[in-house]
Amino acid sequence: MAPQKYSAQVMNSKANGAVYPSSGVSSLKKPKIEQLQADHELFLQAFEKPTQIYRFLRTRNLITPVLLHRTLTFMSHRNSRTNAKRKSFKVDDLLSSVEKMKGEPESPSLTSHLQLTFTGFFHKNVKPCQNSENEQNSVSLEVLLVKVCHKKRKDVSCPIKQVPTGKKQVPLNPDLSQTKPGAFPSLLVSSNEFEPSNSHMVKSYSLLFRVSHTGKRDPNGFISCEADENIDVKDEIPPRRKRNSSLRGDGETTETFVAQMTVFDKNRRLQLLDGEYEVSMQQIEDCPVSKKRATWETILDGKRLPPFETFSQGPTLQFTLRWTADPSDPSTAPVAKPLSTRNSDTSTTESRISTLRPAPVAVKESVSTSMQSRIEHSPCEPRQKLRIFYQFLYNNNTRQQTEARDDLHCPWCTLNCRKLYSLLKHLKLSHSRFIFNYVPHPKGARIDVSINECYDGSYVGNPQDIHSQPGFAFSRNGPVKRTAVTHILVCRPKRTKPSLSEFLESEDGEPEQQRTYVSGHNRLYFHSDSCMPLRPQEMEVDSEDERDPEWLQEKTTTQIEEFTDVNEGEKEVMKLWNLHVMKNGFIADNQMSQASMLFVEICGPHIIRRNLCRNFLLHLVNLHDFNLVTIATIDQAMARLKEIEESFPELEAGQESLDATCNGHSLSLGFSLHGKCTKLES
């Protein structure tokens, strides 16, 4: 019984204790998961700050660019201009060129015309005629330019102007494989329509397409354009039916479809680029609803259709749009493509465009050697597709990897570099807070991104801005003077050819240290006496010689003038003494004797002319009361002042008619040992 009982206890302990091993594992896994989450948070924080900084710099450079990227050596392909005309340029030709421009005001500009080539109007509910003329297999298209003007104070709504640009017969449900490209109808809209004399009154421009189709409606709802031979067109139609635009004859009905596209929005931005367009048309009902209650809807069999099904079921208008200078040129401008995504495939688009181009155009593109044609067709040249993805590293471990993309845009500043070498060079020079390593890939490239621990993130701006008021420091609009720094960086080294090998990771494993090449321009100096920051324009003057700037002299004089408990003579002596001490830099008690004797030598004649000798003596006595000067210094100063007075004999004769002193007493230079003046009667 004992063994059985023991085994039962063991089994019971297994049954009841089966949780203990799993709880131990969970207790081990839980800290590991928390550690991974903490590491991931540190990874996000490490990449968050530089990304926010570069996003801010991107926005600021869009508003006030510091440099033009097309001027950089590795971005030369962004510069579409050439310097060929500089060799033959002459200053004397400027006047003739300006006069020629004024003499030909109607010369077409680069985008003088908006050309619309209509491929066809597609509608499944309309049956084409089988035994009729070609013009009965078409619909009438009217294009209007809608100008939405700014609302005035008295207007309830924005005034709208509709300018008709033309009417065309557009093929109805054409077969594009059997139709010649040159047979498509075309319409031109001059750019003068978009830039009138009062363009400031127009807020936005739109194109309004209005398609009208006449035919018979069968019981199934389809419209047929078959003509009835028994209809007598000479029969008179009642006036009431004439006013009804939807009825043209017995059983005939007219349907009108409209669509509107914005050319320039309210911010004057172009919305319609060169390309192929397919517009969903909306049918206008026979009984129009009030404009205030009108809504755009697409209804079929009582059910609302998704937007993409509208292009397969509802009526659509296909056309090709391009901006051209020569309306007689049948060639098609390069089609502007949107930003390519990771799944973009341009082969189908290119083949579709080539089917719509005339045959002579391809020959023209291949043999044309003009600069303008090369510029126009360069964006459409087939180039190798590169799939680029970024791999973010933190603590030498891969933390995150982006999806592969086909474009060469910088992820931080969205700059289109157009070439892989230019992208890597831009990332290395413009985003040096990160370290980028290029890793070749069979289908493209992989760029490893890690934090640059050696980056000097100290403040490199104007050091005076730190000590200035916040509102004033960053309110300047133009360049300011910086501290002069002279460094010889490099002396025109031989430029190496662009190669992707310079972006590969170094074999020694040490990351490249991004160091600052220029230093010293953000160094800040201070005045030795006032401890105020020294401005760059004050660097040429020694701060030790700036004890008495003009503003400080004026301030001292103004403060003394505000005293009310002293007379004018005492104010004058105080002004002279304070300016004298400031100019010579006397700051210690033991310098007062020297300051007094120097003051007599410099300002003695002025004191004698203004009869301020008594006031000066009172000033020396005041200094003696504070133990700044001795009686011997007072004796020497007054004796020297007496010698200066005796050296001006003409001064005595000129002063007899004047008041003797500021206090109304004549002054003799005799004094006692206690510094008190003795008045001698004449």
Swiss-Prot record:
Zn-finger (C2H2-type) residues: 408-431
Subcellular location: Nucleus
Ribonucleoprotein in keyword set: no
Protein name: Polycomb protein suz12-B
Region ranges (VEFS-box): 523-599
Lineage: Eukaryota, Metazoa, Chordata, Craniata, Vertebrata
Region feature (Disordered): 326-355
Job of this protein: Polycomb group (PcG) protein. Component of the prc2/eed-ezh2 complex, which methylates 'Lys-9' and 'Lys-27' of histone H3, leading to transcriptional repression of the affected target gene.
Family: Belongs to the VEFS (VRN2-EMF2-FIS2-SU(Z)12) family.
Assembly with partners or alone: Component of the prc2/eed-ezh2 complex.
Record GO terms (molecular function): chromatin DNA binding; zinc ion binding
Ranges of compositional bias, category Polar residues: 340-354
Record-linked InterPro entries: Polycomb_protein_VEFS-Box
GO cellular component, one term: ESC/E(Z) complex
Protein keywords: Chromatin regulator, Metal-binding, Nucleus, Repressor, Transcription, Transcription regulation, Zinc, Zinc-finger
Organism: Danio rerio
BP GO annotations: chromatin organization
